[in-house]
Amino acid sequence: MTDVTIKTLAAERQTSVERLVQQFADAGIRKSADDSVSAQEKQTLIDHLNQKNSGPDKLTLQRKTRSTLNIPGTGGKSKSVQIEVRKKRTFVKRDPQEAERLAAEEQAQREAEEQARREAEESAKREAQQKAEREAAEQAKREAAEQAKREAAEKDKVSNQQDDMTKNAQAEKARREQEAAELKRKAEEEARRKLEEEARRVAEEARRMAEENKWTDNAEPTEDSSDYHVTTSQHARQAEDESDREVEGGRGRGRNAKAARPKKGNKHAESKADREEARAAVRGGKGGKRKGSSLQQGFQKPAQAVNRDVVIGETITVGELANKMAVKGSQVIKAMMKLGAMATINQVIDQETAQLVAEEMGHKVILRRENELEEAVMSDRDTGAAAEPRAPVVTIMGHVDHGKTSLLDYIRSTKVASGEAGGITQHIGAYHVETENGMITFLDTPGHAAFTSMRARGAQATDIVVLVVAADDGVMPQTIEAIQHAKAAGVPVVVAVNKIDKPEADPDRVKNELSQYGILPEEWGGESQFVHVSAKAGTGIDELLDAILLQAEVLELKAVRKGMASGAVIESFLDKGRGPVATVLVREGTLHKGDIVLCGFEYGRVRAMRNELGQEVLEAGPSIPVEILGLSGVPAAGDEVTVVRDEKKAREVALYRQGKFREVKLARQQKSKLENMFANMTEGEVHEVNIVLKADVQGSVEAISDSLLKLSTDEVKVKIIGSGVGGITETDATLAAASNAILVGFNVRADASARKVIEAESLDLRYYSVIYNLIDEVKAAMSGMLSPELKQQIIGLAEVRDVFKSPKFGAIAGCMVTEGVVKRHNPIRVLRDNVVIYEGELESLRRFKDDVNEVRNGMECGIGVKNYNDVRTGDVIEVFEIIEIQRTIA
């Protein structure tokens, strides 16, 4: 046998190199991974493993078999006797040295028998050959004698007859020789057949012994120890069944015994227990009643903890997690309580929590990504490879009323601001403008504080931010917020100093204020371009456009024009006649009419596309804003728009996203922890203002909801019962009536059926077109729900000059009113050395023995304090009243 390396041997044995090296070390042989192993070292390792993994020397098997025997008794009744047969077998394992010695003796005996057999065969061959030779010689002698007699008798025959006789004799001799050779060949074949049968018998015996002892040669240590009892018990049980079968063979010669005897080659042969049960049934009597049971001892592995591979999705309930780990739900809840979280068996937990619990209980966690379908749909898109220059997307940002829309208005030469309520931009407007030097796409964002999220979306979807600052107003709160959004998005800023034509304009002050927030002009060594413009007079507009195009040229903006389009939702709303409408800004590719789009939780086929002027278009390239129709619902502003191939898969992805959003929302709900329970117990009564909100566009719904929720205080909370895009319907009115809510419509109206419900239920319906008015009126409604503030106001002081005793009232204080007025039945305080020693109320107020209701400053009176008699000279009685002050929401 050639030498092999440790690595090769490890691969053959299907074990690790480190484990094989450790086994060699345990056997006293030091090896590394690249060393070779000789046959002798291999044998040493096998002997070591066999010695290490040898099982117990003695194995005892006990078996019980129970059956019932019915014995006829007196009175015609049979008596049942329980019979229990106990058997005990002990199997002793031979010592390895003794086994080797016995094997050597058996081998020597087999060799001796083989040698004797060969000698016997050779001797038989020699005897047969000698016998054949003797017979041939005797036959030859007899034939010679006969021939001599015939020759003597026939001397007179002619010479030709003598020649014929000689030829016949020669032929007969050849025949006899052939018969002798055939006999010899048959003897050799018989000997060879006996040798082959003996060799097959020895090989079969060796193969059977090798199979029985196979576990001692190749199995791993852990496998040996775990399978030993099973294999040994099987062999022992087979041996016992064989011996019992031999004993039983001589007993039953009748029909039942023949029926019970297993047929040769029957794979479904009955076990010993079945045979004993059948014999008990035969002995049971005429009725064939059988009340026997077989108790058979089994060998089972002891129960122990099983570590499993637990596959966990993004969300999972506690019960599902318990099923995956094959444990009871109470054990999982107990483990979560140890980790500091309380949960019920049906509660949805997130992936991180489930991972902690499973690892705490000793299982291996496999985190599953549930968005394989979404990734497959997104990867199956035909996008072109060549990128071409595209138009810049410019967002105009700044404080409210600083002239953003007017500036864009002048650029587009249309009056947009007049259409906006109150002159304030309520949602994002997307327009593209053709100039002499190229095309520019503008996004006009609101400047009011309520529209923070809309400004953030505008900054994320843009390439360049034009920051409009009024020269007469300077930097304002929304200006600072716009700077923060631009920096967060990493977008360059071009500053347009507007209203430069006003007399009080101060551009230098604007530069100084902006420099404090990191916006430095180029002449000061910064990177931002400052352009002085006037949206009213049209001053500096061309310079602003040149600055934008210059900045775009520096950025080297490129996009893929061919292929399937992708973009973002700038705004969305529900049109009564057209259905869901979404304003989409295409980022790359070309969007065609008829494309299948996937947009957040919604999907659909583009039925129509319109530009910002309301004109029908068939396609839109990069940096082009369009309105699309045909979606299944109103998408959320900011969602990604992607063109896909298959509408069915798009629907599946949209439904998956909806379910995922719902599961994550449930998983993130507030958990029932002890501190929350105590907080809920100590929390007082909280008033709620319920509102059902409907607006014209999705961005307005978000902005108004955020602003109203920020108004909530500890005493009064704003609760948005329902919100949506579109007009107020009968469903909205019914919801408001059921939840006692206020109906608020922002740039929308109620339809006829909704108005009937509103009149019948006397609901509070309010329309708004400017967000200021909406927020102010909700503040007023919340202020009315605030509990009034109670304030103590001192109305008079009386100094005790003397104390009198009255049988009816006890101690009466003779007082002089020094300040204000003293009123009867008002609460008072008794002060001694400017320290309050008693607080109560006046019981009696008299002047010249007459009861009076009040005593004014500078007059004397007698005061009786209710339930208090320790009034002394020099005390001061302070009279006050409690007034209510109505609070307001700041």
Curated annotation (Swiss-Prot):
Region (G3) location: 444-447
Predominant location: cytoplasm
Residue sites binding GTP per the record: 398-405, 444-448, 498-501
Residues of the tr-type G domain: 389-558
Region annotation G2: where it falls in the sequence: 423-427
Location of region: 5: 541-668
Region of interest (G1), residue spans: 398-405
Keywords: Acetylation, Cytoplasm, GTP-binding, Initiation factor, Nucleotide-binding, Protein biosynthesis
Location of region: 3: 288-391
Stretch list, region 2: 104-287
Taxonomic superkingdom: Bacteria
Function comment: One of the essential components for the initiation of protein synthesis. Protects formylmethionyl-tRNA from spontaneous hydrolysis and promotes its binding to the 30S ribosomal subunits. Also involved in the hydrolysis of GTP during the formation of the 70S ribosomal complex.
NCBIfam families noted in UniProt: IF-2 (TIGR00487), small_GTP (TIGR00231)
Protein name per UniProt: Translation initiation factor IF-2
Organism field: Escherichia coli O6:H1 (strain CFT073 / ATCC 700928 / UPEC)
